[in-house]
UniProtKB/Swiss-Prot annotation:
This is Heat-inducible transcription repressor HrcA. Gene3D superfamilies: 3.30.450.40, Heat-inducible transcription repressor hrca homolog, domain 3, Winged helix-like DNA-binding domain superfamily/Winged helix DNA-binding domain. InterPro entries: GAF-like_dom_sf, HrcA, HrcA_C, WH-like_DNA-bd_sf, WH_DNA-bd_sf, WHTH_transcript_rep_HrcA_IDD. Signal peptide: none annotated. Keywords: Repressor, Stress response, Transcription, Transcription regulation. It comes from Bacillus thuringiensis (strain Al Hakam).
Length: 338
């Protein structure tokens, strides 16, 4: 159990190192307003913290830096919530204030905004479309031979496809077909739509739509959806701006992993509900052993729909990142309920 004095010194060392990226010595600590102990006392406490494994010496400096154990203790016990600037809160809320909530578009923009606000790499795993439910279908006629089929899901995903209208299908038939599809299919999971249309709805259309076989073939492919989630990155090269990663040889494997994307898909799709913080070698990938990954899930009720994550150095602004992720996931979840 650390003493109050040790807790204060450890927190001050980590806060200073996060901000400066420079090893922290006893002289630096002695100049802090919150530290009122003598230099000798500070040195003794630092020696104890080093012996306990919370801080460690670097080869290039007499100062100390946090260890993975130190960061973990800091995140679990010392972290205080950070109030975000009002302009950032407004910027984030404006993103989610769109009249039509398109989850994919929001996910893509979220990754970009988060990377800009943190200067780290942001990763957003979008909702899995196959679990979405159909909200409604629209068919908008462009001319006599061309129309656009628009599908809207319960999460706001909008999918459109240009279709060719056969000469044997008139506009009144299209209108009847849309009404039947909306009546019979609203609330049906996207993964079940294709089979339901071509095995069940066809018999209903037969009684109301002339040349129903031509009409239904016209929609073939419109209701096919990708089975896996889309993954969006923002600031892929941001890690290069961090002092820890100025050595390109050190960061090459990480950049390769980021560029490949598939590994992050596997990491994020199995995330537990809530805020998760993985520090250094707690991450399963060797390329991430000098990084921290903070992730948060967004959901509707009990159904987890996606994950937002920030990848940065272990010297990450943990409090700020967690506050940002909490705001984003809250806004994302509220938007999906619209």
């Amino acid at each position: 159990m650390l003493t109050e004095r040790q807790l204060l010194i450890l927190q001050t060392i980590i806060d200073d190192f996060i901000g400066s990226a420079q090893p922290v010595g006893s002289r630096t600590l002695a100049k802090k307003d919150a530290i009122t102990f003598s230099s000798a006392t500070i040195r003794n406490e630092m020696a104890d913290l080093e012996e306990l494994g919370f801080i460690e010496k670097t080869h290039s400096s007499s100062g100390r830096v946090p260890s993975e154990k130190g960061y973990r203790f800091y995140v679990d016990h010392l972290l205080a919530p950070q109030n975000l600037p009002k302009d950032e809160i407004v910027q984030i809320k404006d993103l989610f204030a769109e009249r039509i909530f398109e989850a994919e578009k929001i996910a893509q923009q979220s990754a970009q905004i988060l990377s800009e606000l943190t200067n780290y790499t942001a990763i957003v795993l979008g909702p899995k479309l196959s679990t979405n439910k159909l909200k409604n279908v629209q068919i908008v006629s462009l001319d006599r031979q061309t129309a656009v089929a628009i599908i809207v899901t319960d999460t706001g995903h909008v999918q459109s496809k240009t279709i060719t209208v056969p000469e044997s299908v008139d506009l009144s038939d299209l209108e009847k077909m849309v009404n039947i599809l909306n009546e019979k299919l609203s609330g049906v999971p996207m993964s079940e739509l294709h089979n339901k249309i071509f095995k069940e709805i066809v018999t209903v259309l037969r009684g109301y739509v002339h040349n129903y076989d031509s009409a239904i073939k016209m929609l073939d492919g419109t209701f096919q959806v990708p089975l896996s989630e889309k993954i969006y990155f923002g600031g892929k090269a941001n890690m290069l701006s961090q002092p820890e990663f100025h050595d390109i040889h050190k960061v090459r494997s990480l950049l390769t992993m980021i560029d490949n994307e598939a590994e992050f898909y596997d990491i994020l799709r199995h995330k537990q509900v809530g805020i998760q913080v993985k520090i250094g070698r707690e991450n399963s990938a060797t390329a991430m052993e000098d990084c921290s990954l903070i992730s948060a899930t967004y959901s509707i009720g009990e159904e987890q729909l996606g994950t937002i994550a920030i990848l940065g150095p272990t010297r990450m602004q943990y409090s700020r990142v967690i506050s940002l992720l909490q705001l984003f996931t809250r806004q994302f979840t509220d938007g999906l309920k619209k």
